[in-house]
Amino acid sequence: MNNIYDIVIIGSGPTGISCAIEAKKNHFSTLILEKGMLTNSIYHFPTNMTFFSTSLKLEIGDIPFVSHNEKPTRMEALEYYRRVIEHWELEIKFREEATSIGNQGNGFTVSTINGTYDCNHVIVATGFYDNYRKLNVLGEDLPKVKHYYDDVHPYIQQKVMVV
C-alpha cells in the first residue's frame, strides 16, 4: 500500500522547492516528483548564462544565496538549489515523470512512469521552459533545428535564422 502524502508537488524547480519548504514548515508530508533532475529547466539553460535577477531575489527557504557577482550564474544557481534541498531534507523522486492525476475519494492519485502516489493535495509546478511553441513549418523537426538557445560557438560564421 502506498503512503498517503498531504501534498505531492510536480516539478523540482524553485517554485516546487519553495512550496515543499513551506509545506514542511507547516508539518505537511510532502513528495516532489521530477521528470528529470533537480531544477531541470535551469540545468538546460545556456552553460554560461547569467540571471537577470540578483541572488537576493532568487533566495528561497531562508538559505542565503551568495554569488561572486551581483547577478548569479547558472552554475551558482544549480549549486544553490542543491544546498537548499539538502538543508531542508526534501523528499524528491528524480526521473519520475508524472503521467496523470486522478480523483481518489477526497484526494488524488498521481500516476508516474514508476507507480502511483496518493495524496490530499497536488501542486503542479512544472514551469514553462519545456513548453516551447512549434510553428508547424516545413523543416522545424530537422536535427539541425534548435528550439532553445544553448551556445553561440557552433554558429560562428554560419548563416542562421532566429524566429
Please annotate each region the language model reported.
Residues 29, 43-79:
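Glycine-rich active-site loop/strand segments that organize a redox cofactor
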Residues 73-131:
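Feature captures the FAD/FMN-dependent oxidoreductase FAD-binding
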Residues 20-22, 43-44, 134-138:
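Short amphipathic alpha-helical segments
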Residues 2-5, 9-35, 148-163:
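Rossmann-like dinucleotide/flavin-binding elements
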Residues 127-163:
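Glycine-rich dinucleotide-binding loop and its adjacent helix/turn
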Residues 37-39:
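Helix N-cap at the beta1-alpha1 junction of Rossmann-like dinucleotide-binding domains, i.e.
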Residues 29, 91-93, 144:
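Conserved beta-strand segments of alpha/beta enzyme cores
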